[in-house]
Amino acid sequence: MNAGSWKSLLLISASAAIATWFSMPATAAEELRIGFIAPKTGIFAQLGIDMQNGFQMYLDEHKGELGGAKVTLIIEDDQGRPDTGVTKANKLILSDKVHMLVGGVLATTGYALAPVATREKMLYIGSIATADDLGQRDFEKYPYMVRPTFVPSQPSHPLGQWACEQGYKRISLIAADYAFGHETAGGFQKAFEDCGGKIVQKIWPPIGTKDFGPYLPTIKSDIDAIFALMVGPMSLQFPKQLRAAGYKKPILGGGTNYDEFILPSMDDGVIGDVSSFMYSSALDTPKNEAFVKKYRTAYGKVPSYYSEANYTTAQWIDETMKQHGGKYPGPLPFIKTMQGIKLDAIRGPVSLDDRLTAVNNIYIKKVEKKKMFGYDKDELWNTVIKTYPNVSQFWNYDKAAFLKQPVYSRDFPPCKFCE
């Protein structure tokens, strides 16, 4: 073969290679498999629906990708039961081969799933299901769990301080009798008594209580206010039955009492009631207004904290995956990266402390009936009346001293002023 023939052959080969290269499909995005646990049936079903909608809305906004990875979202119904949550988590890990678990609702579910994550070395982002000791005394046992929203006592510490600032001296406490109720109420009691207030009574109705008739007559009359912590349908029934029984004094509550998952179903009797949380759909910022309008258009209701928390969880996963080029790095490297990210979230600035628990603004909110965000109808909204910025799970307490005390429970703090 002469030199000219060789040159022709080389040109043909090069042209063919270039054509083949240009015709090759783009590299497919990495797959990120997420196991999402939430109640879709049972008394907590609406909470689970809000959770799923918040997470899905972020996914839809980002064309089903987080940080460049194509998301496969596998949703399992835990029915609001910790034992069912464990069964579903095992299925997601062992059969579905997910990269991470997200969700759960009850604090008791958080306590149940954290050991599963440790045993299987599986990242677990407890977007809702969380509990104080998972980020406190038991933190070292559960290095694979992240709490991107809060722990139960975190919003109630500032509310205890706020109650003192209002001049309240004597308060009765009534809370659902399980971990979330104990820890939320305990945080309020400690902060309130540390600034001079007195909890004079503690009442513990079982979780899921519908009839508060046996409890209402026992509430003391010589008090300045009630602190209540209710969850699920309890949140709707308690204030209605309390007001019907003639109680007219202030009601203070945990955020789940008046959260937007239930607020639209309440009547005007809750106007003026106060609660504390890290989110309100009435947060008057351009970012939240846009979020509320988009969510309401998509799902026919205003977003709840269950919605926002899971939207923000998806945002945090997105930002973390971006820093790893869309490739899941494994649970501990993922957590290390996530811990270094400070989000400008819908609810405001949020970051993780050194024990993988969110640091948030905590908002004191009052139920008001008014128009917001251009809607032409008067509706119930949780108006923000005070902001406590950058609240950690340890509030204003020394962390080492705080960790030496027992976890908040039915018996701690002790009811030293009970009558």
Predicted features by range, described:
Residues 187, 232, 237, 283-341:
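Extracellular/periplasmic ligand-binding modules, especially the Venus flytrap/periplasmic-binding
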